[in-house]
Amino acid sequence: MELHGYKAFNKGLTNRYGKEFKVGETYEISGPLKFGNNGNGFHFCERLEDTLRYFPAMEEEIEIAEVTALGDIEEFEDEYYCYYDMYCTDKIRIDRVLERKEIIEMFLDKNNFRVMRFVQGFKLNPNELDLYKLIYESNICVMNAIAYYQEGDKEVYNRRAKLRRLRKTN
């Protein structure tokens, strides 16, 4: 079975354990496939924003690649944190590395939930931030996420709650 998705890497296409990967190459594991931090296999996600759970893209530059799983696949879902369609495979091909501009443009037309998860985990530069604020200026959910996660406005949700309480009493 083939399944396409995304995999995040440290700069230089290395994983969290220091293993280097190359575009166009296929990698296989030995031993039984198992999802998790102490697992065995190559993790990837169906949606790009879910890869940000595994790499600190708010603090450091990362690379995100399109990948294809070519072997056995194990699926994992974390309903508590709303992470779905995360996978682990015993055989993966690194198809290509996405350019930053591609990543930014991918989320200019996604639903609120996906955009909010993206801005929660991927540090936008000032020009990208201005673009997102322009595109989503009438979308209070996305604008609040931008204010909180990108601009560090830790009171944005409290202000919104106070406004709602005031409106209910009038």
Model regions and ranges:
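Short, glycine-biased loop/turn motifs at secondary-structure junctions and
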Residues: 1-170
